[in-house]
Amino acid sequence: EQRLQLRSKVQRPRCVAVVERLLPEPIAREWIRRMTRAIRTVDAHSLITVGLVSWSLKRPKVLYSGFDPHVLAGEVDFISVHLYPEAKKVDADIETLRGFAVGKPIVIEETFPLKCSREEFARFLRESKSHASGWIGFYWGRTLAECRKSREIADAMMASWLEIFQVGIP
């Protein structure tokens, strides 16, 4: 029995305690610091950001990435976030966007009406104007006219996005 206890202590990786102590914010922050330093050594002028997701915000019972915008704001030039508004949840999606307001400009760098109607997406864009400095969406290299001619669902979705995008944020 004593040999078994000793063996289990020996086989337990020592790094587990270190990882448990460091996760998640310190590792995320150090990674961003190192990347920023490396970029700045070759390019002192380009803006630096990290793509954040809705689960970058700490919330009860929700997966958490460790890339907390409040912690990381000092390391980046602007906040960029991937947000896909969901049907009947536009208010919650705007509230999520508000969570990224940490004193830096916000760019919604990845968005698309993937999980909501065109009308809900337009509403999301309209209401996000008070928080976002810009928006970037998908473009797969096909024009609006090409997408309209196609009979593929993906092209219909892309056409809807391109129509909204070309009109501008309502």
Features from the language model and the residues they span:
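Extended, alpha-helix-rich binding/interface surfaces that flank or overlap catalytic cores
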Residues: 143-170
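Accessible peptide chain termini
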Residues: 1-2, 170
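Extracellular glycoside hydrolase catalytic/binding regions
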Residues: 2-142, 147, 157
